[in-house]
């Protein structure tokens, strides 16, 4: 069987200034912004996260502000099949990930 785990918590912020949003959430969560993380670029800011915890990422978006989870799997097709059997549906297939929606409407 393949392996999957909670990989990241993304805080989607409808803002023109992702740096201000990242600083706010860093202070709320008692962390720093990690400017050297390879994920800190463009519309994304990574917060300092211990290696045994899910990544916390601030993302500038144009839709309403919300929070979403990223699930990491070593076999994406198998994980999509498993989640579909549980009642999730595919919303979009992108280059390296699949956006899905839970039966209760949350996207992940």
Predicted regions and their residues:
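N-terminal beta-strand motif that seeds the catalytic metal site of vicinal oxygen chelate
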Residues: 1-23, 28, 67-71
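Extracytoplasmic/periplasmic beta-strand context in beta-sandwich domains
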Residues: 7, 43-45, 98
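Hydrophobic beta-strand residues in large extracellular and virion-surface proteins
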Residues: 9, 58, 88-90
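Vicinal oxygen chelate
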Residues: 15, 50-51, 64-65, 69-104
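Short, basic/low-complexity N-terminal boundary segments at the transition from targeting/disordered tails
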Residues: 27-30, 77-78
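Short secondary-structure junctions
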Residues: 29-38, 86-93
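Conserved short beta-strand elements that form part of the metal-binding/catalytic scaffold
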Residues: 31-67, 107-108
